[in-house]
Amino acid sequence: MIQATIRRSHDKGILSFEMTGHANFAEHGQDLVCAGVTAVVFGAVNAVIVLAGFEPLLDIGEDGGYFYFEFPESLDPEARQKAQLLIEGMIVSLETIERDYKDNLRVTTNII
């Protein structure tokens, strides 16, 4: 199962998100859940880089079972606002996938 964990603060919105695990919906190379989650996450992160104009802190696992995104501490408020909206859109898409594939994807939010 892919576990998506979103970290939020009370006042700054999304701080980071982490993806761990594998969907195990189908064999490697044919796993539609994995492909969907990957497309949503990479699309959102690429949109943040291009449209919000900054490089987030990223850690991408070598075997494909790990992805970490974090907003930098010092970030222009306008860039943060754009990126927050893009990542919120990513979360909505992940939750939509989760609705149909509960055994393969779990999205949780931690407020700190």
From Swiss-Prot:
Highest taxon above the source species: Bacteria
Cell inner membrane found in the keyword field: no
Residue ranges of coiled coil: none
Residues annotated as catalytic: H22, C34
EC number(s) reported in the record: 3.4.22.-
Entry keyword annotation includes Phosphoprotein: no
One Pfam family from the record: Peptidase_Prp
Classification via CDD domains: Prp-like
GO biological process: proteolysis; ribosome biogenesis
Signal peptide: none
Molecular functions (GO terms): cysteine-type peptidase activity
Keywords in alphabetical order: Hydrolase, Protease, Ribosome biogenesis, Thiol protease
NCBIfam families listed in its UniProt record: PRK14553.1-6
Family the UniProt entry places it in: Belongs to the Prp family.
Assembly, per entry: Homodimer.
Record PANTHER family: HYPOTHETICAL RIBOSOME-ASSOCIATED PROTEIN, RIBOSOMAL-PROCESSING CYSTEINE PROTEASE PRP
Protein name per Swiss-Prot or TrEMBL: Ribosomal processing cysteine protease Prp
Species name: Bacillus subtilis (strain 168)
